[in-house]
Amino acid sequence: MTILGDDAPRTVEAVGKLIPFSGMAYHSRWSGREVNAMIHTGERVPLENHTIQTAPGDVIYWREWERDADDVSEAIAVYYGAELTRFHRGEQFVNVFGRVSQEHWDLLREIGERIWRQGGERLEILWNASQEQAP
């Protein structure tokens, strides 16, 4: 995975503080081909490098942007297909802070479809936010 530290420095910093991360990953109900895990950064991460149109391999951070509070819902996710990001209240911005290289998209699709059909799976992230590349 390529970390987009120049494009989303506050996001990379906030998410990087949670690593190593272990939690359950689930398939999205609203944004299509997306696998996500709920997190809690304890920070008010700003919109940066944000979009509502994701591409395969995009690694994103989402929060309830409209709530100016510390106890909002937050998630990290990876997309295995192009999608419009949305929530039950409509389109939602996400911060793109990483990209999985195209050579791994088939594996992403396989994992995403398996989670979609069979349910959540344990997710472990061992990436070091100070590195430009993550395994």
Residues of each region from the PLM?
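Second-shell loop/turn segments in exported
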Residues: M1-T2
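Glycine-rich active-site loops that engage anionic ligands at enzyme catalytic sites
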Residues: G5-P135
